[in-house]
């Protein structure tokens, strides 16, 4: 059964982070799982039945009102604020908890579905580092065609599934 772990700030303030798998302080690897619009953190954690990797902790932040941002992922970035920035901060918050527990980014994956995939992919693009992997299930980078994508860093060594 998922457990409440930590809350986030911003428009998603007061929303829990649910956990499945190993306790965070005992895990060797982590997967941050980001739910889609209209779904819940508990819904995305249902995938852990299939993923079920020994030594993994699965962490899923919950969006306020079950949506990370109000418009389509192809809408102008400004029209998805403040939810977009708050959602990105929620992912950063979960990753900070994972790092504090001693799990390196190289052993941390991000997985998102639909709107959650868009948010996870956008986070990784803006915060390029050597993650353990990224899986974007039915999603893409946020913003219309022509949105500047000159983010610093590289994702060359990251396993990606999108």
Please tell me what each predicted stretch does:
Residues 140-162:
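The feature captures the conserved acid-bearing segment of alpha/beta-hydrolase catalytic domains
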Residues 5-107:
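Serine-hydrolase catalytic machinery in alpha/beta-hydrolase-like enzymes
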Residues 46, 122-126:
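Active-site signature of alpha/beta-hydrolase-fold catalytic machinery across serine-
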Residues 111-116, 120:
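Gly/Ala-rich beta-loop-alpha elbow adjacent to hydrolase catalytic centers
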Residues 119-123, 145:
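Hydrolases whose catalytic domains are alpha/beta-hydrolase-1, hotdog thioesterase
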Residues 61-62, 111, 135-138:
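Alpha/beta-hydrolase-fold catalytic nucleophile elbow
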């Amino acid at each position: 059964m998922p457990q409440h772990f930590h809350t986030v700030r911003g428009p998603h303030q007061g929303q829990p982070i649910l956990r499945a798998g190993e306790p965070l302080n005992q895990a060797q690897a982590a997967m941050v799982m980001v739910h889609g619009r209209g779904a819940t953190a508990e819904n995305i954690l249902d995938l852990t039945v299939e993923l079920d990797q020994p030594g993994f902790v699965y962490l899923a932040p919950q969006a306020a009102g079950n949506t990370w941002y109000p418009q389509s992922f192809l809408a102008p970035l400004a029209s998805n604020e403040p939810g977009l920035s708050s959602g990105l901060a929620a992912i950063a918050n979960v990753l900070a908890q994972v790092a504090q527990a001693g799990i390196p980014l190289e052993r941390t994956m991000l997985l998102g579905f639909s709107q959650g995939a868009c948010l996870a992919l956008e986070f990784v693009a803006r915060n390029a580092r050597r993650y353990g992997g990224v899986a974007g299930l039915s999603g893409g980078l946020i913003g219309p065609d022509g949105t500047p994508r000159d983010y610093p860093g590289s994702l060359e060594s990251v396993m990606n599934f999108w």
